[in-house]
Regions:
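Catalytic core of nucleotide-sugar-dependent glycosyltransferases
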Residues: 1-195
Length: 195
């Protein structure tokens, strides 16, 4: 895992902007420092980000920006940021609610450390295996339907991700859920403690 930047090193104003957002309301997108995302996938990603009207932080290599649709950066200035690498700090921020990733090992560990669910788009090598583990073993995220970015595929993955979280929440607060068990355990401690 990459160590965080020292406090106050908010070079791009990213953390300051995240501080103004609601908890779990920001989409974070990053494909690592090595991967070159295909231009048509960057276009689809930009369309999803703009259409969603959700706040976002997109951490990409500078040469990737030229593939966004004309005017995208201008139209989304108040909605999001497209900046170089700041991943650890971003994933540790409570405003981040979903992370779209290339499924690199460090990225997954940082996502877990930040408690952020993921949408995986592996590109090659170990990323493919990591993506399968993310979805099928750890169950902390989903991979894109077709394995590449399409507007429909990303929107569908977001929908599945939120439905999966809804089901977990319903289960946890249901009659036999962990929330009820924890409340009963707390009540036992409170009412059975001698003062």
């Amino acid at each position: 895992m990459i160590l965080p930047s020292p406090p106050g090193a908010d070079t791009y104003g990213c953390i300051t902007r995240l501080d103004k957002q609601k908890v779990a309301s920001v989409a974070y997108v990053s494909f690592g420092s090595v991967t070159a995302t295909p231009p048509h996938e960057l276009v689809a990603l930009a369309e999803v980000l703009e259409t969603s009207e959700a706040p976002f932080v997109c951490s990409l290599r500078n040469n990737s920006k030229v593939h966004f649709p004309n005017g995208f950066l201008d139209r989304t200035t108040s909605q999001g940021l497209v900046i170089p690498w700041t991943q650890f700090d971003v994933l540790a921020h409570t405003a981040v609610g979903v992370f779209t990733t290339h499924c690199g090992w460090n990225s997954l560990l940082e996502s877990i450390a930040g408690g952020v669910p993921t949408i995986g788009r592996p590109f090659f090598s170990h990323q493919t295996l990591n993506g399968r583990v993310l979805e099928n073993v750890w169950e902390i995220g989903l991979q894109l339907e077709s394995g590449v970015f399409t507007k429909h595929g990303v929107l569908n993955s977001l929908d599945k991700n939120i439905r999966a979280l809804q089901q977990l929440a319903k289960k946890d607060i249901g009659p036999n859920g962990i929330s009820v068990d924890n409340f009963i355990a707390l009540s036992d401690v409170v009412f059975n403690t001698k003062i």
